[in-house]
Amino acid sequence: MRPQLSDYQHVSSGKVRDIYEVDDNTLLMVVTDRISAYDFALEPAIPDKGRVLTATTMFFFDAIDFPNHLAGPIDDARIPEEVLGRAIIVKKLNMLPFECVARGYLTGSGLKEYNANGTVCGIELPEGLVEASRLPEPIFTPATKAEQGDHDENVSFERVVQDLGQERAEQLRDETLRIYSAAAKIAEEKGIILADTKFEFGLDSEGNLVLGDEVLTPDSSRYWPADTYAEGIVQPSFDKQYVRNWLTSEESGWDVESETQPPVLPDDIVAATRLRYIEAYERLSGKRFIDFIGG
């Protein structure tokens, strides 16, 4: 008999995840179907999104050689039936206060900063780069973790050193880039470009660095089809960039600089986003989403 979600104490909720305490050492992390963009929670939710993100994270936890926060299998008996397939049991960690971003291509906030001053997070880049340009080598571009409702802020590597010390900062940078490169190779073999991604790390009780949160999902990464890749244009994508693109289109009527709540997503955008997330998982993993637990 599985426990009920109400049997666990609710600890916190973010834009997408709800956290519950299982015991002194472990948490239940529930991935909802909520979606956010530009630091706003959007309406409506994307059906099956929580399961897709969980399935993708589980695939990469298995594929990537680095300690992670998993504390049980996807069908762990401690997971309530009502969230089976979109929840995992995880170890409690002391989470570090930075999002660790790896970029292999120039787009998004990185492109905006580059166009302004030729750098990304203080890293000087060659002249003449445009939307979707491949960088000479992947770069580490950390960001502060914003509270819900606030904006994440890109920061320099020196800021990470200042807060965490040289050794820990270098470890974060080196492991972020190593994991990104390994994942990019997996994606490349499946005809997909991993343009960028972000990781969150924490420390376990012995001070070891551990991967937490989600990894390499369509929420935390930009995935582009390799067969249509071209510099200088916004790429079609298997991630929530599709939602971002609609929000900044004339059709939505929303001004990203307005600081106002974005409009409700149309049904066709919701449906297309769901299919993109599922396609990303199926192409990357080689598995059918319909076969993943909880369906």
Curated annotation (Swiss-Prot):
UniProt source species: Corynebacterium ammoniagenes (Brevibacterium ammoniagenes)
CDD domains per UniProt: SAICAR_synt_Sc (cd01414)
Protein name (Swiss-Prot/TrEMBL): Phosphoribosylaminoimidazole-succinocarboxamide synthase
Annotated signal peptide: none
Annotated NCBIfam families: PRK13961.1 (NF010568), purC (TIGR00081)
Keyword Methyltransferase (UniProt): no
Matching Pfam families: SAICAR_synt
Annotated pathway: Purine metabolism; IMP biosynthesis via de novo pathway; 5-amino-1-(5-phospho-D-ribosyl)imidazole-4-carboxamide from 5-amino-1-(5-phospho-D-ribosyl)imidazole-4-carboxylate: step 1/2
Enzyme class: ligase
Chemical reaction(s) catalysed: 5-amino-1-(5-phospho-D-ribosyl)imidazole-4-carboxylate + L-aspartate + ATP = (2S)-2-[5-amino-1-(5-phospho-beta-D-ribosyl)imidazole-4-carboxamido]succinate + ADP + phosphate + 2 H(+)
Family: Belongs to the SAICAR synthetase family.
Superkingdom field: Bacteria
SUPFAM superfamilies in the cross-refs: SAICAR synthase-like
Gene Ontology molecular function: ATP binding; phosphoribosylaminoimidazolesuccinocarboxamide synthase activity
Keywords recorded for this protein, A-Z: ATP-binding, Ligase, Nucleotide-binding, Purine biosynthesis
BP-aspect Gene Ontology terms: 'de novo' IMP biosynthetic process
GO CC terms of this entry: cytoplasm
EC number of the protein: 6.3.2.6
